[in-house]
């Protein structure tokens, strides 16, 4: 994981990449959604080896027990995007809550009884002028306690390297067409800071309650690769 400062990118390269090579991590013979091999099909990466080593060291030094470490892993594995969708729905319907989300996601989430963890999470809002998308260029930093485990494609080398340099092309591969008049900003998550996209509220939802609004929000829209 990275401890370098986060940075945003508002540019893209105006060219497309065809993914016709079966060795490409985003290759999909059906041409629908980016395909990423199961992690079991690929060798352990450096951060995975380090994570196991750190876990073993913490147990050996008595900082945590194996049961405590296992319980934390199970807690993280049990999380789903549902927690994040509640935050988004409340932000759409309560301007004061939205202001608190924009100031401090962690504190705002706790108001709803959600434990977002201790790592700071910053909200970035999609508007008629700006579209945001999240990546972790070095590994897979991600607000797991708020929106669940990261999808395999988020961890893929192809997504991590390409979305920074050609965001519109990558978004198009998810079926997301962003007008040239809209600025695309790419936010690089780090070990010290995570991001949450607040999707643009769909038109025609003014009369919906929070529960129904939350059902409209998807994991991918909170990452920024799709819109609602």
Residue map of PLM features:
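Terminal, compositionally biased segments used for targeting/anchoring and flexible tails
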Residues: 2-228
């Amino acid at each position: 994981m990275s401890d370098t400062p986060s940075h945003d990118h508002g540019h893209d390269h105006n060219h497309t990449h065809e993914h016709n090579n079966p060795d490409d991590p985003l290759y999909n013979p059906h041409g629908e959604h980016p395909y990423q091999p199961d992690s079991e099909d690929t060798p352990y990466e450096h951060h995975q080896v380090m994570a196991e080593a750190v876990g073993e060291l913490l147990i050996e030094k008595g900082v945590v027990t194996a049961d405590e470490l296992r319980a934390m892993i199970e807690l993280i594995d049990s999380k789903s995007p549902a927690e994040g969708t509640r935050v988004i729905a409340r932000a759409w319907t309560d301007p004061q809550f939205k202001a608190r989300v924009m100031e401090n996601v962690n504190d705002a989430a706790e108001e709803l009884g959600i434990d977002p963890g201790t790592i700071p999470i910053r909200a970035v809002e999609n508007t008629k002028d700006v579209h945001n998308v999240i990546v972790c260029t070095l590994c897979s930093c991600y607000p797991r306690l708020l929106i669940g485990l990261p999808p395999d494609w988020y961890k893929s080398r192809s997504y991590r390297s390409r979305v920074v340099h050609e965001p519109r092309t990558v978004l198009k591969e998810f079926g997301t067409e962003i007008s040239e008049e809209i600025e695309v900003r790419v936010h690089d998550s780090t070990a010290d800071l995570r991001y949450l996209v607040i999707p643009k509220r769909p038109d025609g939802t003014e009369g919906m309650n929070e529960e129904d609004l939350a059902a409209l929000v998807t994991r991918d829209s909170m990452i920024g690769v799709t819109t609602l």
